[in-house]
């Protein structure tokens, strides 16, 4: 058989095999077109489960007369015009295939009128070449699509239709999903002349729970926990049922939407399931209605014929974001705020990237710790609030720390009598707390230094380790902690959990905050030196180390962490070496006076100089 171009009707019928699975598929495509047209009211009439009639009328913007024929053509759409549009789709439809595919397997008529037109027009396609006929009609502003005798010309497809009741149940489920996505649209559904569903539009700021209860039932509404979670371009809102009271009937309620598009996505379901796993049995499923808003450039919806699936460009970030959002509202059910004596509760801190969710936002502010924390007092001049348990989460943290170091370095020396040798002492003292001048980098991780005419070699990785230990060792106040954007959740044994609970006070002084449940521990904050580390490796090793200890001293733990940190630089530059030495000289002056083994090695150049002179 020679290669040939398929007739338009046959090509459309092949496409319909992917798009039009059953009457519910037709309803989905046509209602989504109505929503894209800006409709605020949609009336859906079904007869015999959709096998005989599917009629959908809306009050959207309508279609112009000269565009009606194009509307029934393949790959004709008003929703995208370029590749840039395809990479950031905001409409529900975009391929321009639905009407052509549906008209090829049914008797379809399209009647529409725009606000600018005085009369409406009706179009329908027929024949082998799908020629479109347009004629005048009576119709208000908006569009009506009527699909008669679905699959009349494809008997093989028609015989696979289920009973009238089953097919209508599928249509009813599609309308339920769409009604949950668009609270601002009135949707009426009738079957065989009887109104079955009436979903009235909810005004902006109105009670969405009323429609939620009408669709999902009062049992779900009674157990629903509201979620409001945001980070950057990601927003998660909706409801999740309390897993402790989830029944098999409730578990059937699993509705998820991405940018308003109903979705069945494995990644999203896995994140929700993982957040609920400690509270659900092995054979139980979570119940939820969740809405994910994401930058359209960060999600690809053109990966499934029926658009049931999407692909996220940063799938791990999306997974962990959803997981943490759901987990936060579930943990709120178990947590109660600790009493803070008789002190008034400080006002909530403004957080640019996150806003408080239902419960508490662990991306920005972890729960209060049990160990006694030092009391902070507000700065008298700045007018700022008292320091939070996470002082480094405030924008001015680095600047404040630098100011403290500067004040320490500029502390005036005791007054001395004006004796002759005294003026040289400050210079000598300053010189004694310096490793010297960095000449170059040798073998990528050693610095060649010059001081008072002497040459020495310094191991930068060892100096970095001593600096990290100094930064991690608590002084008069605990080490400042920084909350993790995505908290780290790890499974632990009973022995490891017991060790963590015993070491909680010491870890809190080191800036490590965690929360544990039956079989897991969630690391919510770490000190600054650990932010750039691979915590997936470091934290399990730290837990293993703690499980072998009987005494938990912050200094010993800090030393262990410092020895097990990976260097931030595989190959050092001059600028990085100079910065490191400046920090070491400031925080660890004792290393300059008495360098430990493995840090500094003097280099004797006299034999080399003598050899050169002897030549």
UniProtKB/Swiss-Prot annotation:
Keyword annotations: DNA damage, DNA repair
One cellular component (GO) term of this entry: mismatch repair complex
Entry-linked InterPro entries: DNA_mismatch_repair_CS, DNA_mismatch_repair_MutL, DNA_mismatch_S5_2-like, HATPase_C_sf, MutL/Mlh/PMS, MutL/Mlh/Pms-like, MutL_C, MutL_C_dimsub
GO BP annotations, alphabetical order: mismatch repair
SMART domains linked: DNA_mis_repair, MutL_C
Short name of one Pfam family: HATPase_c_3
Signal peptide: none
Region (Disordered): 363-397
GO terms of molecular function: ATP binding; ATP hydrolysis activity; ATP-dependent DNA damage sensor activity; mismatched DNA binding
Biased segments, Low complexity type: 364-391
Family designation: Belongs to the DNA mismatch repair MutL/HexB family.
Task performed by this protein: This protein is involved in the repair of mismatches in DNA. It is required for dam-dependent methyl-directed DNA mismatch repair. May act as a 'molecular matchmaker', a protein that promotes the formation of a stable complex between two or more DNA-binding proteins in an ATP-dependent manner without itself being part of a final effector complex.
HAMAP family for this protein: DNA_mis_repair
Name of this protein: DNA mismatch repair protein MutL
């Amino acid at each position: 058989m020679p290669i040939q171009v398929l007739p338009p009707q046959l090509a459309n019928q092949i496409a319909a095999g992917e798009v039009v699975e059953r009457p519910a598929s037709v309803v989905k495509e046509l209602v989504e077109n109505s929503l894209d047209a800006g409709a605020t009211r949609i009336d859906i009439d079904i007869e015999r489960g959709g096998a005989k009639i599917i009629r959908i009328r809306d009050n959207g913007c309508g279609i112009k007369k000269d565009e009606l024929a194009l509307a029934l053509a393949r790959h004709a759409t008003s929703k995208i015009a370029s590749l840039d549009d395809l990479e950031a789709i905001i409409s529900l439809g975009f391929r321009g295939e639905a009407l052509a595919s549906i008209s090829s397997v049914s008797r379809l008529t399209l009647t529409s009128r725009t606000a600018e037109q005085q009369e409406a027009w009706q179009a329908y396609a027929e024949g082998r070449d799908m020629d479109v006929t347009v004629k005048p009609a009576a119709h208000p502003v908006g569009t009506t699509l009527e699909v008669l005798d679905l699959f009349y010309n494809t008997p093989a497809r028609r015989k696979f239709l289920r009973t009238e009741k089953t097919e209508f149940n599928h249509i009813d489920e599609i309308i339920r999903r769409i009604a949950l996505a668009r609270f601002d649209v009135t949707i009426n559904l009738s079957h065989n002349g009887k109104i079955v569903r009436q979903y009235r539009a909810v005004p902006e700021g109105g009670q969405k729970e009323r429609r939620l209860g009408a669709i999902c039932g009062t049992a779900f509404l009674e157990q629903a926990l509201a979620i409001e979670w945001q980070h950057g371009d990601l927003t998660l809102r909706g409801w999740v049922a309390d897993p402790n009271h989830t029944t098999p009937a409730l578990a059937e309620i699993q509705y998820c939407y991405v940018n308003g598009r109903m979705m069945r996505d494995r990644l999203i379901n896995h994140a929700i399931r993982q957040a609920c796993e400690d509270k659900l049995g092995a054979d139980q499923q979570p119940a939820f209605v969740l809405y994910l808003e994401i930058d359209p450039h960060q999600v690809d919806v053109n990966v499934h014929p029926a658009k049931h699936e999407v692909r996220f460009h940063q799938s791990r970030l999306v997974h962990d974001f959803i997981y943490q959002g759901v987990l936060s509202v579930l943990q709120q059910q178990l947590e109660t705020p600790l009493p803070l004596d008789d002190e008034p509760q400080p006002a909530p801190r403004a957080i640019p990237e996150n806003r408080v969710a239902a419960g508490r936002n662990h991306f920005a502010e972890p729960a209060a710790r049990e160990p006694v924390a030092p009391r902070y007092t507000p700065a008298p001049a700045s007018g700022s609030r008292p320091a939070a348990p996470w002082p480094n989460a405030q924008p001015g943290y680095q600047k404040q720390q630098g100011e403290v170091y500067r004040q320490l370095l500029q502390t005036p020396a005791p007054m001395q009598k004006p004796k002759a040798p005294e003026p040289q002492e400050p210079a000598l003292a300053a010189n004694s707390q310096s490793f010297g001048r960095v000449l170059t980098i040798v073998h990528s991780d050693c610095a060649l230094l010059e001081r008072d005419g002497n040459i020495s070699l310094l191991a930068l990785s060892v100096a970095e380790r001593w600096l990290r230990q100094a930064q991690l060792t608590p002084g008069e106040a605990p080490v400042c902690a920084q909350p993790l954007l995505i908290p780290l959740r790890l499974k632990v044994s009973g022995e490891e959990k017991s060790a963590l609970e015993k070491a909680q006070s010491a870890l809190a002084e080191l800036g490590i905050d965690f929360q544990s449940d039956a079989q897991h521990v969630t690391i919510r904050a770490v000190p600054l030196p650990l932010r750039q580390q691979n915590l997936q490796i470091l934290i399990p090793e730290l837990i293993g180390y703690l499980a072998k200890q009987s005494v938990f001293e912050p200094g010993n733990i800090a030393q262990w962490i410092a020895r097990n940190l990976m260097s931030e630089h595989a190959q050092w530059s001059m600028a990085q070496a100079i910065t490191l030495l400046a920090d070491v000289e400031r925080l660890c002056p004792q290393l300059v006076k008495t360098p430990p083994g493995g840090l500094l090695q003097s280099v004797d150049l006299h034999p080399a100089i003598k050899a050169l002179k002897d030549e």
